[in-house]
Amino acid sequence: MVKGGIIIKKWLIICFISIALGYTIIQNFLLKDKEEQKSQTENITIGTELGNVAPNFLLQTVDGKEVHLTDYKGKKILLNFWASWCGPCKIEMPDMEKFYIDMKGKGIEVIAINATASEKSPDHVKQFLQENKYTFPVLFDIQGQANATYQIMSIPTSFILDEKGIIHFKHVGPMTYENMVKYMDSL
């Protein structure tokens, strides 16, 4: 009887140690995972520098629909700041239209933010787009808030964002179709 009691005690001790060890291991993995998530969250910086998450905005399409940048999360983005009176902007727009058409359905979006505050009127911009048969999405920055947030000093200025909204490239001046493809392919 004593032998059986000793065996049971040993078995209970082994079970207790195993449970305690298993609990400790699981807790350490969960804690480590939480610390990694917290660390990743703390390292996110919103801004306009390379490696930052691009600042969100709320602007209107040419049809008056409100759009946030975050509406495009999960897609690579060519974010372009321009105006209809800007000569270099006019030079890059045919390439941007071709890029937009070629990338449709491939998880890549073109978003052209018009510096509407510097234009004659939104109707003038609509007319410019229609006359040139541009079909890529255009957003009106009527108050100039997006241009200010993104610290746009000259136009055209373009940002290349990955699917998480992180800025990988900033290009000041007109871009060619080849530039656009090269930037996107490097993501």
Residue ranges and their predicted role:
Residues 73-75, 105, 134-135, 152:
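Active-site acidic short loop of glycosyltransferases
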Residues 73, 81-98:
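Conserved redox-active cysteine motifs that mediate thiol-disulfide chemistry
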Residues 127-135, 140-187:
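Thiol/disulfide oxidoreductase modules built on the thioredoxin-like
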Residues 56-77, 101:
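A short beta-strand-turn-helix
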